[in-house]
Swiss-Prot record:
Keyword Coiled coil part of the UniProt annotation: yes
Organism: Homo sapiens (Human)
Segments forming domain REM-1: 5-81
The protein, known as: Rhotekin-2
Gene: RTKN2
Stretch forming the signal peptide: none
């Protein structure tokens, strides 16, 4: 049988305070060790900022120790007064409201400088270190330290502080601490000071100081740190935030200011603090109760029942057909409001038929909407009734925070300032173009590129990763027929600018295939005309040599596929300008020739015929 499940706060067990007692004692031991480590850091600190942050952390440790001690005393009192009685009456039972999350963020504290102080740049103004402490029960949180001078008009804290286990009666005490950071007031030579203390403090005084640390006297520790290191944070202002201050927007709160103009830590506060305080009760953000219920329906005067998986959360009862619909984020089949106007009645009178029903009545203008549900047994009915009454109590305690779920916005951490992450010298080396590290990395890149392209990177013959769109026209699937042009002695020879040999195409269908006899006739014709074209051949030789030198001096073109030419028929004796013909159409780059082929005189003669 599928029974309901309780997802809210369960009943407190008898051994729970003892477990909390152990956890708090562990936290106390941790803070004591943290405080000892901070004292060691203070003895080694040489910079002003280091001393300021260390003293601030020491104050936080002492505040947490005091809070843990008070909480431990409260738990001991609860154990002594705890009783095991259980009240069966749900209405009159003593209840405890559910816990919730409280988030405080975007704190702004305006300053009220005089015009002469704010706009005056005649001399360097005083600087102050400001931070906030948030205290609620045993929880103590702090913000970052903010430096303030007369040019600042608002003290801004970007931290988001979240209290996870807060009740509706929470009280968050906000304390603003200030310290003047003038060089004369802060000791920056702790080693000399330690040597001086070693020679001037007697053994009896040293034993008193060590006993103070061992006895965990927080006030004496703070006084000792301020006396030795010259840094002391003073309470500048404070306020208390409660449930009435919670709102899903910015709100202004009054501050109680301490000190006056004569105090070294004093700042001209306006008297207000603006922040965003958000409350998320567990009854709004989590499922208070869940289980299967049978809903009664009237269809044409007949009573029928449908089984639904119901979830009680945020002042509403969401009804689904199955639990899987919740994970799939399917819209619920039925939503029943559960608020302070809702009336719930148990109808457990028919013991023979074993029917356990309850009705949910929501008044609306002019009428009342009633939903009847049935459970499987009496135990489930008691659990559902207990969950409803607890939910009513939670809604009444958290008040306006249960009208709508407030969202907690957690901002991403900002980048720290540049001077906190690296030194100026490292930034200079990163920006320098003459850095040996930069040259070495460039050499490695070139060497890697040469290895990847098998040396073709140096001569510009690395192929493209993706061919251009028009490359499909030159995939080699088309036949190419080229008809050579016959040169006469009187005409000037035409020279290919690239001087490269094309791949021999297939012979045309109307021509005879190659034979040795035809080749011998061609050689004989060349020998007969050798004397007549001596001047032309000399010019051709010079042109070939200059072309060769030109190719050796510049990078060679990348090999590409041949251009599929159309089948052109030329009449006998017709002369065609080869250069003009190739300029009219895109010509692919010819194949690369070796040095042996370029220096062969027979290739020069073939280029002219």
């Amino acid at each position: 049988m599928e029974g309901p499940s309780l997802r809210g706060p369960a009943l407190r067990l008898a051994g729970l305070p003892t477990q909390q007692d152990c956890n708090i004692q562990e936290k106390i031991d941790l803070e004591i060790r943290m405080r000892e480590g901070i004292w060691k850091l203070l003895s080694l600190s040489t910079q002003k900022d280091q001393v300021l942050h260390a003293v601030k952390n020491l104050m936080v440790c002492n505040a947490r120790l005091m809070a843990y001690t008070s909480e431990l005393q409260k738990l001991e009192e609860q154990i002594a007064n705890q009783t095991g009685r259980c009240d069966v009456k749900f209405e009159s039972k003593e209840r405890t409201a559910c816990k919730g999350k409280i988030a405080i963020s975007d704190i702004r504290i305006p300053l009220m400088w005089k015009d002469s102080d704010h706009f005056s740049n005649k001399e360097r103004s005083r600087r102050y270190a400001i931070f906030c402490l948030f205290k609620m029960g045993a929880n103590v949180f702090d913000t970052d330290v903010v430096n303030v001078d007369k040019t600042i008009t608002d003290i801004c804290f970007e931290n988001v502080t979240i209290f996870n286990e807060a009740g509706p009666d929470f009280q968050i005490k906000v304390e603003v601490y200030s310290c003047c950071t003038e060089e004369s007031s802060i000791t920056n030579t702790p080693k000399k000071l330690a040597k001086k203390l070693k020679t001037s403090i007697s053994k009896a005084t040293g034993k008193k100081i060590s006993s103070v640390l061992q006895e965990e006297d927080d006030e004496m520790c703070l006084l000792l740190s301020s006396a030795v290191f010259g840094v002391k944070y003073n309470l500048l202002a404070h306020t208390t935030l409660t449930l009435e201050s919670a709102e899903d927007s910015f709100k202004t709160h009054n501050l109680s200011i301490n000190g006056n103009e004569e105090s070294s830590f004093w700042l001209p506060l306006y008297g207000n603090m603006c922040c965003r305080l958000v409350a998320q009760p567990a009854c709004m953000a989590e499922d208070a109760f869940a289980g299967f219920l049978n809903q009664q329906q009237m269809v044409e005067g007949l009573i029928s029942w449908r089984r639904l998986y119901c979830v009680l959360r945020g002042g509403k009862l969401y009804c689904f057909y199955s639990p899987e619909e919740i994970e799939a984020k399917v819209e619920p089949a039925l939503v029943v409001p559960i608020n302070k106007e809702t009336r719930i009645r148990a109808m457990d009178k028919d013991a023979k038929k074993r029917i356990h029903n309850f009705s949910v009545i929501n008044p609306v203008p002019g009428q009342a909407i009633t939903q009847i549900f049935a459970v499987d047994n009496r135990e489930d009915l008691q659990k559902w009734m207990e969950a409803f009454w607890q939910h009513f109590f939670d809604l009444s305690q958290w008040k306006h925070c249960c009208e709508e779920l407030m969202k907690i916005e957690i901002m991403s951490p900002r980048k720290p300032p540049l001077f906190l992450t690296k030194e100026a010298t490292s930034v200079y080396h990163d920006m320098s173009i003459d850095s040996p590290m930069k040259l070495e990395s460039l050499t490695d890149i070139i060497q890697k590129k040469i290895e990847e392209t098998n040396g073709q990177f140096l001569i510009g013959q690395h192929e493209e990763s993706l061919p251009p769109p028009w490359a499909t026209l030159f995939d080699g699937n088309h036949q190419m027929v080229i008809q050579k042009k016959v040169l006469y002695p009187a005409s000037e020879p035409l020279h290919d600018e690239k001087g490269k040999k094309r791949q021999a195409p297939l012979p045309p269908s109307d021509k005879l295939p190659f034979s040795l006899k035809s080749q011998s006739n061609t050689d004989q014709l060349v020998k007969d005309n050798w004397g007549k074209t001596s001047v032309s051949q000399t010019s051709s030789l010079d042109t070939k040599l200059s072309t060769l030198m030109h190719h050796l001096q510049k990078p060679m073109a990348a090999p590409r596929k041949l251009l599929p030419a159309r089948r052109n028929r030329l009449s006998d004796g017709e002369h065609t300008d080869t250069k003009t013909n190739f300029e009219a159409k895109p010509v692919p780059a010819p194949r690369q020739k070796s040095i042996k082929d370029i220096l062969d005189p027979r290739s020069w003669l073939q280029a002219q015929v």
